[in-house]
């Protein structure tokens, strides 16, 4: 929280100050998510999947061999009844819970910057909501937490634009009102193409560096807010 405080942001609710919507740390809320996932299963908005990693990988490779984008084929939705799923779970068989994305129609959302965005449902995958270890995936936990915490506005990077239609399908399946979205572009920087492992420049056939424009990221050695403070930069300048 130190970085947020340094920017001058002050919050009246959270892990360090408490409030009516706690707990605020996801691992302390882990018992909530399976309950909501099973609510979706009962409503038909999700289903239990017993496919092994090997089966999924074989299907993925088969799709790649055909030049197709892999999507889970809903095999467990069509072949495993809810009663059978509950028996197999009671017997200790590993499983995940997947979102049951419609195969027809549109999924859409409204963004304050990009306006109305919609995609064909048949292009979306049945993403995992609850993993085999019982923990929620990031996307599912976000939807549940935002609803329970009465979040009115969701502001995040454009890398989450492609996830928003599936978020709204979850809101619809639950019968919840979705938040107002604002997807903002990341901070970009002029750089050169580098190797992901060594972080060294990748040269072209003439031995020259290859200029690119990329997202500012610590993964590539760019300084963080705290790094800049330690180097003596004033926070007022960084905030600009």
Identify the role of each PLM range:
Residues 217-240:
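A conserved active-site cap/scaffold subdomain adjacent to cofactor or substrate pockets
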Residues 2-25:
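A glycine-rich helix N-cap at a beta->alpha junction
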Residues 20-29, 155-157:
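Conserved short loop/turn motifs at secondary-structure junctions
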Residues 39-215, 224-225:
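Active-site cores that bind ATP or allylic diphosphates and position pyrophosphate for catalysis
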Residues 1, 34-41, 239:
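Non-transmembrane alpha-helical segments in soluble domains
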Residues 4-7, 172, 234:
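Glycine/small-residue-rich interface belts in oligomeric ring/scaffold proteins
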Residues 8-13, 29-37:
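A conserved beta-strand/loop capping segment in the N-terminal third of enzymes
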